[in-house]
Structures are given as structure tokens and as C-alpha cells.
């Protein structure tokens, strides 16, 4: 992850208007992985869609409920993906409002074949926090249109950060959750994240004429195309760095991470190692590197091409 300093520092629990019919409430869960906290969005002026309720927090639940103005009700609860900083509060919010919970699926939904094989072989996640208890009231399909009284959202399946990750198109704006953010590059951590899927999802979003991205963490991204170009170039540069290192000698993901992520703080080195392994899985699939034996996080990889 590459951290980009900015002046984004809203008050947790306070609803901030971003555009007509759109407000954001920051959850009180800052961390090196969540930046200032999770962005919860309220869309609509009558029937409200809550996008990413956030982590379990009584204070955040109350802030969402308090943001409902006279004549408004929460009609939809939409979860972009099942990391524990985005989905767990959905159940309590549904109990409080009666609104259905919509998402692409449970924690396993959308997982690629190679990541399923890694998971079945015993590879555990890197501690990002998967909400294994999550089950939506209704599963969404790619391309589906969700209708509210005065809004509609297009479901765009964007696997990569997580197999069940979706973005939500709202006219020329897009809620990109953790796939595209301005403050950092997205974590891709096998067996839940797949870099091949991530790059394909970036290209898919790049082919659309967006004016603004509303991310899961951090400030709005005002140059969507430029940010996507940067993310794609950043990943390709990481790939070149890995291949250059492997041209010198075979190495593990851990060794490569410490050689390449020289400016990354210690708390984020574990995430860096998972990102490197994601690249190695992708490069293995492209027959550019090979592990010594089975594909696994601790394998030593050598360059083939």
C-alpha cells in the first residue's frame, strides 16, 4: 500500500453532505488499514440506501439512525464486501429498520478458482478480517439495477480486493469501496484477494466515463481515470520489481517484500508480503515464475521469463 497524505479528517458520527441526495458518515475505526475509518454512505432523500454500514459499533449504528430526517426511512442496506470494517453492522441495522441486506454473496462468493484451491490447501488470510457470519437477505448480480424512490444504483462486480467485492454506479459517480481509494493502493491478499481479478476490475472501471469515485476509506477521488491509470501502472511497476529481483536469485514473498517495500512501515510489512504473494500467484498463472513445489505463501519462487 502506498500512503498519500491528505487533509481528510472528518468527525466520526457526523453526516456530511457530499452531493444532493448523498451523505457520508465516518465510522469510529481508524487504523493503518482503514485510514480515518470506514465511510458509510446514505443515498436518497426519501427511501435511503445505506452503503457499507461498517463495523460493529453502537455509536455508529445510532449515528446512522439519527441521520434519518423526517419523512425518510432506510429502505436498502447494501454491503460492498465482507471485510469486518464494512459488513458486520448490517445485521443490527436491519433489525432496527426492517430493511433488507443486499450484497454479492457470503464471504466465499466470487472467489476465483486458484484462490479456492489455495484456501482448500490451508492458506489462511493475512488478518484483514473476514466476516464469515455474513449472509445477505438477497444476493446481487453483476449488472443488476437497484431502484430506490429517487435513485438507482448499478451493481458492478469488481473482484480483486475480495472475491465478493462490488462497486456501485450512480450516474457519473461510483462507490468503489476498497477497490479504488485515493489515500492508498488497495490490499490484495490471497486467498481472499486475487491480483488477476483486481487488474481486470481496474480495466473494467477504466472503460467508463466516471466523474468521481466515493471510496470505502478516505476522501472522494476527483480524477477517477487518472487514479485508475496510476493503480494499474503501480501494479505493473511492482511486477517488474519482483521479476528484476527474481532475475538475481530465487526468493520467497517475505524476502521480496523486504527488498522492494523499503519505505513501508513495520505495521504494514505483513500486508506488503501478502501483496507480493498476490503478484507471484498472478505471475505463476502467466508462466513467468514458478514455485519450488506446490503454490503456497512460503514457497521460493524462480523466474521463468
Show the residue positions of the predicted features.
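C-terminal regulatory/interaction regions
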Residues: 4, 244-305
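Conserved beta-strand hairpin/beta-sheet module of binuclear metal-dependent hydrolase folds
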Residues: 8, 12-71, 167-182
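Residue-level signal for inorganic ion chemistry
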Residues: 21, 64, 217, 242, ...
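Active-site HxH/HxHxD metal-binding segment of metal-dependent hydrolases
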Residues: 36, 55-149
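Short active-site oxyanion
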Residues: 48-49, 74-78, 241
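Metallo-beta-lactamase
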Residues: 48-50, 55-57, 118-121, 126-137, ...
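Histidine-centered divalent metal-coordination motifs
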Residues: 80-86, 161, 217, 279
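Aromatic/hydrophobic pocket-lining residues that form the small-molecule binding cavity
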Residues: 87, 198, 202, 276
Amino acid at each position: 500500500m502506498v500512503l498519500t497524505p491528505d487533509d481528510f479528517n472528518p468527525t466520526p458520527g457526523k453526516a456530511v453532505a457530499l452531493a444532493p441526495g448523498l451523505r457520508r458518515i465516518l465510522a469510529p475505526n481508524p487504523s493503518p488499514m482503514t485510514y480515518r475509518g470506514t465511510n458509510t454512505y446514505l443515498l436518497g432523500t426519501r427511501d435511503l440506501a445505506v452503503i457499507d454500514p461498517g463495523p460493529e459499533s453502537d455509536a455508529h449504528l445510532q449515528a446512522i439512525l439519527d441521520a434519518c430526517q423526517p419523512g425518510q426511512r432506510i429502505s436498502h442496506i447494501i454491503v460492498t464486501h465482507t471485510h469486518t470494517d464494512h459488513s458486520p453492522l448490517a445485521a443490527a441495522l436491519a433489525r432496527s429498520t426492517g430493511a433488507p441486506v443486499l450484497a454479492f454473496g457470503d464471504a466465499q462468493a466470487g472467489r476465483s478458482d486458484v484462490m479456492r484451491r489455495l484456501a482448500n490447501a490451508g492458506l489462511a488470510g493475512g488478518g484483514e478480517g473476514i466476516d464469515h457470519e455474513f449472509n445477505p437477505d438477497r444476493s446481487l448480480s453483476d449488472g443488476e439495477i437497484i431502484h430506490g424512490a429517487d435513485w438507482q444504483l448499478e451493481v458492478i462486480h469488481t473482484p480483486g480486493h475480495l472475491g465478493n467485492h462490488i462497486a456501485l454506479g450512480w450516474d457519473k459517480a461510483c462507490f468503489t469501496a476498497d477497490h479504488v481509494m485515493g489515500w492508498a493502493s488497495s490490499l490484495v491478499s490471497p486467498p481472499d484477494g486475487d491480483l488477476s481479478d483486481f487488474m481486470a476490475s481496474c480495466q473494467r472501471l477504466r472503460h467508463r466515463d466516471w466523474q468521481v469515485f466515493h471510496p470505502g476509506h478516505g476522501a472522494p477521488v476527483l480524477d477517477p481515470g487518472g487514479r485508475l491509470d496510476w493503480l494499474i501502472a503501480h501494479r505493473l511497476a511492482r511486477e517488474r520489481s519482483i521479476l528484476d529481483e527474481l532475475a538475481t536469485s530465487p526468493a520467497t514473498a517475505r524476502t521480496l517484500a523486504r527488498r522492494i517495500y523499503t519505505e513501508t512501515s513495520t505495521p504494514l510489512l505483513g500486508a506488503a508480503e501478502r501483496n507480493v504473494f498476490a503478484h507471484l500467484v498472478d505471475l505463476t498463472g502467466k508462466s513467468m515464475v514458478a514455485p519450488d513445489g506446490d503454490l503456497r505463501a512460503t514457497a521460493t519462487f524462480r523466474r521463468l521469463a
